[in-house]
Amino acid sequence: MSLSPHVENASIPKGSTPIPKNRNVSSIGKGEFLGSSSSNNSSFRMNHYSNSGQPSVLDSIRRPNLTPTFSYSNGVYMPESHRTSSFNDSYLPYDKNPYAKTTGSMSNKSNMKIKTKKNAINTNTRKSSGLIYTTKVDKELSSIDKVNDPNINGLVCAGKTHLGLYKFSPSDRSIKCVHDFITPNSNTSTRGTTSLLPKLSKRTRQNKFSTIADVKTGFNNYKNCIAVCNNSTAISIYDLNKSSSIDNPLITSLCEHTRSINSFDFNMVESNLIISGGQDSCVKIWDLRSNKSKSSNRSDISINTASDSIRDVKWMPGYNFASKNDQGSSTYGNLKSGYKFASIHDSGYLLKFDLRQPAQYEKKLNAHTGPGLCLNWHPNQEYIATGGRDGKCCLWFVGDNANAAENTVLNYGNSPSLHAPNTSLNNSGSLAFPKLTINTGYPVTKLKFKPAYSSNIYNSLLGISSMGDEAEVRIYSLARKYIPKHVLLSETPSLGLVWWDENLIFNIDKGTRINGWDINKEPTVLENLSKNTTTWRDLDGNGLLSVDQEIGSYEVVEPELQPTSSTTCKKHPGTIKNPKNGNPENQGIIGGIKKGFSHTGLTSFTPERPPTLKAGPTFSSKSLTLASGASSFNSSSASLTSLTPQTENREEIAIEPPCIITLDIPQIFNNIRLTKIAHSRKKNVISESSSMKNSPVEKFKYLARQLKFSYIREHNVSDSADTAYKNDIENIDVVKNATETHGDNTTTTNNNDDGDDDDDDDDDDDKIIESHLLKKYNFPENNTWATLMNEKVNNKKSKRNSSSSREFDEKDVRSSISSISASRQSHDRSRKIDKNVEAELQEKIQTLVDLISIATHNASVYLSIDDLTNFKIWILIRDSLLWDLKWMTSSQISSDNASNMDANESSDFEAGENLKTGKEFPEEDGAGTSGAESLVEERPQAFRANSDEPSDAEKKPVSKLKEQLKNTEIIPYAQPNEDSDEVLTKLKELQNQRLESRTKMGETVSDDVIIEEDEHEHQEEEQPHDSPTKSAQFHASPIAKSIPILQKREHRKSFIDTFMLHSPNGYNGDTDIGNEDDNISPRFTYNSVSPRSKVSSLQSYATTTSQLETFKKLSSHTAPIIGSPRHAPSRPDSIGREQLSSSLTKKLAKCKKIIADPPWDTKKLIKQLYNQATETGNVVLTVNILFLFQTIYQITEIDIAKDAIAHFLLLLHRYELFGIAADVLKYCPFEDIMGSEGDQSSIRLFCERCGELITNESSKEKLRAEAQQTGNKKIMDKFGYWYCDSCKKKNTSCVLCERPLKKLTMVILPCGHEGHFQCIQEWFLDENEQECPGGCPGVAFI
């Protein structure tokens, strides 16, 4: 038989080692491959060639060399000199070798000697000798399969316009095209002859196969059948024996799929069955015995997988592996090979089915993150290898859990854990992990297991063909997944592969070349790798890498088998012969299943797995259609042969990979440098912060990411007040740890208060930054929260003795706000606050706690970038909020404690004074400024005596503020005179009236605080609940309202005192007579009084002259009047300035008139900081203040706040901080933050008749002029957009009343008719109609 002119045969002498490397061969590049070639189970479509008979221009395009100089495929470095495992310049085909002799005939080319070039490679490198067959075809190839006839050394290759039968000869190592089923005249070389087929001429349109071509051959009785995609939705079956041009080789066509077919496969056991899957997500099973016609449009079994497109579908193989034992030869097979099949889908899911129960899949595994492209069953075990577009090849166990122990081995190196599968038989949605994952780096389009028996799954070989530019076929041993065992290089990228037997493997490439290798003659990759190599670990040169001299192997050591006498081996189901008589449709698996379908039977087809009732894939056949999970099977008519179980369990020992020793020299040097230079890390952090400071853009981005702009998020996250306090305490510890290391006089703290020590690097950096900046700028430590915490610890260490009989009993303040409320109610059950007021108070306290935590966090952020100005601003805001929080919690305790005073030892004057001065605010001086934690953890000092208390003369003033306020003269007003007698008389009367009214009304201490949404709406409601006790707290001494640091050493000048004394509304030394009157009130105390004293400042002078006694009386009578309900403010920072009645004296009026808000008033302070931020252009601080405090203190107008936040959002978008901008919008307290830019949209109306834009400007001007002339403004009501000035026609009228649609319009969606809202409402709702008023068919409204 002559050779086909379409095949270029390269005969190779026996014993030679030819390795083709034709770089000038005509081929197509990567781009043409994606557009013209096809690949089995691939995910892309390719265009057909043109219908003309001329050769494609793509065949003449030269493909560039795809072999790189250096290859890093799969993490293995291979220089080109070592990439000769399959390709070598010394072995080129004769027709392409420039050194070959040009004389001689074609018949003796195979016997000619080839002059080879000297190959300058390492002599230790083993050359390839495994390439046995190679030939080039001038037709495009896309799929390959072997002929399952042992008497024929045949291959079947398919392409768009080619379906050829090829035979290879082991004797002369040649491949020849025997027959082309598409162009049967290709075997004749006579020019001008035509096909012998009837009605076929030269101009007959050439047949083409599907764009997604796949080819498969049958088994056993159907080994002469070839299945191929004839078009996108049909499978054509050809007969190999009908190779003559007279016979028509087409047997039948299977065309039930509605979309393209991607894969099909013959059953190895029941060879008459063929399965197919396609884009329609359906699996079709065909019985070739029942499809004897030329075309069949209905399959025997149809399964809708209820998933997406099927990329590949395969039957479980049924190989017969013969072995010898004591009883003789035996055959190993698989019992379930005739019934199981699997499919892989676009979604990456792997589904396993049992033909006996097709209504429900057995397993569903999420195999790949992207589309799955191919799968292949293990020859004798229930494992499936899958390949996907994600570049991974995964091994999955799909058997029963009972057999899982057979396949476990010991782990080694970085191999995945070989755990037992966690899927059950009926668990369709179980989550499982692959037994093994091979990262190829390219989409895996084809993979095939070596058809050899393997008792250990990890001794199996797997051939992989990728879609990338790597022109090679890799063969992996599952025992060593990181380094392939063989790399078979081809000229162009591989398109498919097939194992002929255990040693011979064929592939086709993009260059239309068929290659065959003998892997026993191929060197392994480890043999060609250099043994003495030291190189950098990565491209950046970070570390060295060397390879151990022990190479290792690719196999797992297996112990010898221990055969048992009880092992009996039965014949494989593939050897079953159909009886000669009887209907073939009722024989075999299909017949057994169809016989087993019964409407009344309740038993399962097999007792091992009952039918499931889950909703799953739909199943249909010619005889019966089953609903999901609603059918049952009958096992009365199916006789199935069984196989012996597989080999018994054996213990396996995994091989150890080569030892890789790394030496990270830069890291070693870096560690040495860090040990020698202890402060280098601190310098690096400080240099980074300074570099950020020099870049305003980077600083803005950093602040936008790190700062907290809203307390709403923090409030929502907190489940209770305890969570908020816990977060606040953690923030306190960060600042505390940062300041512990600087200053010689800093008090040592106890780090075990919270029980948490954070050793992270980030916390260490914060400590370094904060310590450095505090020391650099000499920031006074008595203004930091850490010092307040130090004081709290020291106070806990000091001894506390019980007080006198007039003092209160010791009580612990619990660690939450709710416990404070419960303790207060237990003290005096008769005085209960309304539940609504209590809830409102708790909410406001929680808000304050959140704001304090945010202020602390923002201060630490500014400190980390060396921005001391903004750092002090946030510290100032935090301390001001602490004062408000302290007053709210302390007022509750003090009001209850005041009721426990002994009436016999305390007069009305003393009770008021003790509550206002000595009993509450000295406690606040001691611990009130130590943050939220001190409010709920520390015991109030006002309720205890201190034996170690120093004398009054030894105590020093806390701040300069108290010294300046002490300079006022009070003696003239303390001396008794006529005016003072009159004042005392009036004050005494008012006090008695106040006390009587208070007793009658049962007043309690008001819980109102400074945080109010609407101050004026709630002021009248809160006034009846005010008491002199609260007013006294408002006018306590300035020392009580400041934030002093109590330590037994001389304090430096406080930053808060310095800043506040220069406030425009603050105090100075120039006071007049009126201010002196003001100083008489309990607002001030003497500097010689200890803040920890249990006795008020006035009581400490009880034994002095009568002048002081008179002053005490004056103070006691003045306080109730100032704190009367009539003048009680609803906020502690806003005191009424209304004029007193004419009955009071002039000096009493002055005493009330000049009372001003304290300089640390929170609202005043935040407004000043806001104005300063706007004047200096501090955008971040401005927006931060508006976010946190606008809704609480009304910093500015609401429109200005919205505009500022909207511009801040635009700034975030400009610097691509979209996530932060989204959070700003999410937690913004204003809904319409974007204003006209975010809520309004321009809608253009076009005329439905002429298509012009409806503006109606001309009619608008006419109506406006007419309205001006007549003075009738109702004329403008005629204007609208319900008509068009261009075409002078009206738009659609109402479907019911047929009047113009001028106002609100409703549209009926099913038909599109429009109508007035009133008309549609009357038609559908009032009249209960369901059809359209226009008479459109169907229900329009339900």
Swiss-Prot record:
Pfam families linked: WD40, zf-RING_16
Cellular component GO terms held in the UniProt record? cytosol; GATOR2 complex; vacuolar membrane
Q: Where in the cell is it found?
A: Vacuole
Chief site of localization: other
SMART domains per the record?
Answer: WD40
Composition bias (Low complexity) maps to 630-644, 815-824
Which ranges of the sequence are coiled-coil? none
Q: Where is the composition biased (Basic and acidic residues)?
A: 952-963, 1016-1028
The Gene Ontology biological process terms listed for this entry are:
positive regulation of macroautophagy; positive regulation of TORC1 signaling
Sequence positions bearing Phosphoserine:
S1037, S1081, S1088, S1090, S1124, S1134
Membrane-crossing residue ranges in chain numbering: none
Q: Name one GO molecular function term.
A: zinc ion binding
Acidic residues biased stretches = 753-766
Q: Where is this region: Disordered?
A: 1-39, 559-593, 600-619, 630-651, 736-766, 788-831, 942-963, 1014-1047
SUPFAM superfamilies from the UniProt entry: RING/U-box, WD40 repeat-like
Q: Which domain of life is it from?
A: Eukaryota
- Renumbered ranges of WD repeats: 207-248, 256-296, 305-342, 367-406, 439-486, 489-527, 844-884, 1130-1170, 1217-1256
Any idea which UniProt keywords this protein has? Metal-binding, Phosphoprotein, Repeat, Vacuole, WD repeat, Zinc, Zinc-finger
Q: Which PROSITE patterns match?
A: WD_REPEATS_1 (PS00678), WD_REPEATS_2 (PS50082), WD_REPEATS_REGION (PS50294), ZF_RING_2 (PS50089)
Ranges annotated as RING-type zinc finger: 1294-1336
Q: What does this protein do?
A: May be involved in a process influencing telomere capping.
The record's family statement is: Belongs to the WD repeat RTC1 family.
Q: What is this protein called?
A: Restriction of telomere capping protein 1
Q: What gene codes for this chain?
A: RTC1
